[in-house]
Amino acid sequence: MSEEKIVNTEAAPEAVAERPARAERSERPERPAKGPFGKKRFESRRKVCKLCAEKIENVDYKNFQFIKSFTMDSGKILSRRITGTCAKHQRQIASAVKRDRNLAILPYSLPKK
C-alpha cells in the first residue's frame, strides 16, 4: 500500500499585497580631513616595485647584496606588502633567496641574541 500525497493544483492564487516604497535614505555628511584628535590623516603612498622601476627582468642570485635587502635581519623573506614588489619579482626573489641559502651565501636564520 503506497501512500500518495494529493496536491491541490487548482488552489486560488492569493492576492499579493504590494510593498510600500522604501524610505529615502539621508545623505551621510562628508568626513573631515582631520582625524579624531585633530591630526591630519595619514595617507600611505602606493609602493612601486623596485625591479619594475629599474626594468630588471630577472633576479640574479649572485647579487646577494641586493637580495639581502629583501630579507629581515633574522633571515626571513619580507612580504610583498612590505617591499612593494610585484608578484612576478617576489617569486623570483624568493627562489633566489632559497638558492643563496642552499649555496651558503645567505643564512637560513640568524641565532637569537
Swiss-Prot record:
GO CC terms of this entry: cytosolic small ribosomal subunit
Cystine crosslinks: none
One GO term (biological process): translation
Basic and acidic residues bias (residue ranges): 16-33
Keyword set includes Lipoprotein: no
Segments for region (Disordered): 1-41
InterPro entries in the cross-refs: Ribosomal_bS18, Ribosomal_bS18_sf
Sample GO molecular function, one term: small ribosomal subunit rRNA binding
Family: Belongs to the bacterial ribosomal protein bS18 family.
Described function: Binds as a heterodimer with protein bS6 to the central domain of the 16S rRNA, where it helps stabilize the platform of the 30S subunit.
Complexes and interactors: Part of the 30S ribosomal subunit. Forms a tight heterodimer with protein bS6.
Protein name, entry field: Small ribosomal subunit protein bS18
Organism ancestry: Bacteria, Pseudomonadati, Elusimicrobiota, Elusimicrobia, Elusimicrobiales
Gene: rpsR
